[in-house]
């Protein structure tokens, strides 16, 4: 089985359907004997340019190890699902399990806000 990185963008009005979509896609990969190495829901993000007059989309990243049949099935599912605005499936040489730069940046920002809030409370006293 080969390793793949899959990113798909969902219509922002369909964001509540994303967990169900992820569940369907991961279950089809696991049923075929594949593995999910990394799954990240990046949430709703600003697009670089409008797609179908939309300025935001819900992003999901998956790194998987799966047979080609499952990847073909996912491509077909993405193509005929109107909620999926764009998708990309890239074959990789190795399994990628570490957090993506998007998640790392988000985690680095969280402690800063906590420190800033503590400094603000100290200033009031």
Curated annotation (Swiss-Prot):
The keyword Ribonucleoprotein applies. Keywords: Ribonucleoprotein, Ribosomal protein, RNA-binding, rRNA-binding. GO terms for cellular component: cytosolic small ribosomal subunit. The keyword Ribonucleoprotein applies. PROSITE patterns: RIBOSOMAL_S6. GO terms for molecular function: small ribosomal subunit rRNA binding; structural constituent of ribosome. Residues 116-125 have a biased composition (Acidic residues). Residues 100-125 are annotated as: Disordered. Residues 104-113 have a biased composition (Basic and acidic residues). One of its GO terms (biological process) is translation. HAMAP family: Ribosomal_bS6 (MF_00360). Belongs to the bacterial ribosomal protein bS6 family. Binds together with bS18 to 16S ribosomal RNA. This is Small ribosomal subunit protein bS6. It comes from Histophilus somni (strain 129Pt) (Haemophilus somnus).
